[in-house]
């Protein structure tokens, strides 16, 4: 029975790649406003062409989106020519879109023509700080190694990012730290850092009167916006993406970013765009908050339920083995403990390249299952080990088979500890599942990521409050289950 259940759960996960939601076209976006806006424009064009579209917002950086595209987890996402050359193809000499198209075809990927604007990297400072130090260009930073720099984590690791830039300009800055893109702007305005990396079409540059330092050595290449798509994407969908070609210049893109950040609504930016070009967008209407909450919550529940089912079915048997003395026990407890020490984002990144996983809900369920093992395994082992020798001797006198003793006597006696472990694991999983949105698995992490990107507390609470309520509901459910699953004589009574 147990083996059959495991097979069913694993089969559900494998089928899950095709059955989680089932949109005909899945779009991805990086974790910054402009990428969200561009994918929203593409989404509305695709819906106008008759496709059911899911936009997986803020999935991460270049490598995660590129892996997702290659593996078929998404059909398309917005990218930049400089990034394609430097980070994806690692062929900086590829000049034209035509050359890029030929090289990308080797990976089963196509590229649209340019959307019309260049969004290159830049370094920015507050006007007051730049004027105070007399800094106008990047080379001026060499005179001020004491300045505090806050860079996005992707920029710190890129081939066209901080390391090569530092060498090109001969900089020797003493304080360089990694920061989220949106939080970096807050740190800059609060005076916690002096310089940060930015995109030249960021609305926050004009909104906050920031100074863009001149790239006097011409380090940064052109970053012309395009869409990458899988070549097996339906022809009508590709044509819908291409309707965006040549329709966006720098000024229009900056304004779209500004609308999104001011209204906290990417659809509002898309509506303005379609009005400007004389098309009708937003074909399916704005999704209501109620509908979004239902969608996020249902996906979150699915992720938590599947991962917890796996953790229970596999964790309790492992806990039984771990309750016995010997090397196997130490190995099981050590490995489950080690998994718990791996940072959540690192575990997701490690799982993505594994065949049959990739980007999406399957990987999220596997990661959540691994994180959920330790409380269940350890509590099961502890509960069984704590059974007194007298009770064990009495069970032996009854001449029961080992399996019967385990199922009828030992596990019921250990049930309070086991259920406490399952309860702890469930609460942890509900919270950890919010990170699943970073790899396009959806759930209540979507509004949290979007809110962080927009610096909007209300949007963050749209995900945080339901997640907290879900955890409270789970706590209450387990309190009820305790009455049915724990033998009456073992239940704690108030004194």
Per-region residue spans from a language model:
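A ligand-binding cleft/hinge motif common to bilobed small-molecule-binding domains
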Residues: 81-100, 186-214
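Loop-to-helix entry region at the N-terminal start of transmembrane alpha-helices
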Residues: 295-303, 349-375, 415, 459, ...
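Cytoplasmic-entry segments and transmembrane alpha-helices of multi-pass inner-membrane transporters
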Residues: 295-296, 301-303, 318-351, 368, ...
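C-terminal transmembrane helix and the adjacent membrane-cytosol boundary/short C-terminal tail
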Residues: 326, 381-385, 462-495
């Amino acid at each position: 029975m147990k083996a059959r259940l495991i097979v069913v759960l694993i089969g559900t996960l494998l089928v899950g790649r095709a059955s989680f939601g089932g949109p005909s076209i899945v779009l991805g976006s990086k974790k910054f406003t402009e990428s969200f806006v561009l994918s929203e424009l593409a989404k509305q064009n695709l819906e106008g062409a008759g496709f059911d579209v899911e936009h997986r917002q803020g999935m991460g950086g270049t490598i995660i989106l590129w892996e997702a595209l290659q593996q078929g987890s998404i059909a398309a996402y917005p990218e930049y020519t400089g990034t394609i050359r430097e980070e994806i193809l690692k062929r900086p000499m590829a000049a034209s879109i035509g050359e890029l198209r030929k090289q990308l075809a080797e990976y089963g990927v196509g590229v649209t023509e340019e959307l019309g604007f260049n969004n290159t990297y830049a370094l920015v400072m507050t006007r007051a700080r730049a004027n105070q130090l007399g800094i106008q260009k990047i080379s001026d930073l060499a005179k001020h190694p004491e300045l505090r720099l806050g860079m996005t984590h992707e920029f710190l690791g890129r081939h066209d990012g901080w390391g090569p830039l530092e060498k090109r300009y001969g900089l020797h800055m003493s304080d360089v730290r990694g920061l989220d893109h949106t939080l970096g702007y807050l740190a800059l305005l609060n005076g916690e850092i002096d310089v940060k990396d930015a995109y030249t079409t960021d609305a926050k540059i004009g909104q906050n009167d920031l100074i863009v330092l001149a790239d006097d050595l011409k380090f940064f290449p052109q970053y012309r916006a395009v869409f990458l798509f899988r070549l097996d994407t339906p022809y009508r969908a590709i044509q819908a993406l291409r309707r965006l070609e040549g329709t966006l210049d720098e000024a229009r893109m900056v304004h779209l970013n500004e609308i999104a950040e001011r209204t906290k609504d990417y659809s509002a930016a898309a509506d303005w765009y379609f009005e400007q070009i004389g098309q009708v967008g937003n074909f399916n209407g704005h999704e209501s908050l109620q509908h979004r909450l239902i969608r996020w919550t249902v996906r979150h529940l699915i992720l938590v339920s599947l991962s917890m089912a796996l953790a229970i079915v596999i964790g309790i048997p492992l806990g039984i083995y771990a309750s016995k003395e010997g090397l196997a026990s130490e190995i099981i407890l050590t490995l489950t403990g080690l998994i718990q020490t791996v940072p959540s984002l690192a575990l997701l990144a490690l799982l993505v390249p594994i065949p049959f996983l990739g980007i999406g809900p399957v990987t999220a369920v596997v990661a959540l299952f691994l994180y959920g093992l330790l409380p269940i395994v350890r509590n099961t082992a502890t509960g069984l080990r704590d059974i007194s020798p007298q009770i064990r001797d009495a069970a032996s006198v009854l001449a029961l088979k080992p399996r019967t003793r385990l199922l009828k006597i030992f596990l019921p006696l250990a049930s309070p500890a086991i259920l406490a472990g399952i309860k702890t694991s469930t609460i942890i999983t509900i919270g950890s599942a919010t990170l699943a949105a970073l790899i396009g698995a959806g759930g209540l992490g979507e509004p949290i990521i979007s809110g962080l990107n927009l610096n909007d507390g209300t949007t963050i609470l749209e995900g945080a409050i339901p997640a907290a309520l879900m955890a409270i509901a789970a706590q209450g459910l387990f309190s009820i289950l305790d009455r049915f699953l724990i033998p009456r004589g073992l239940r704690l009574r108030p004194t």
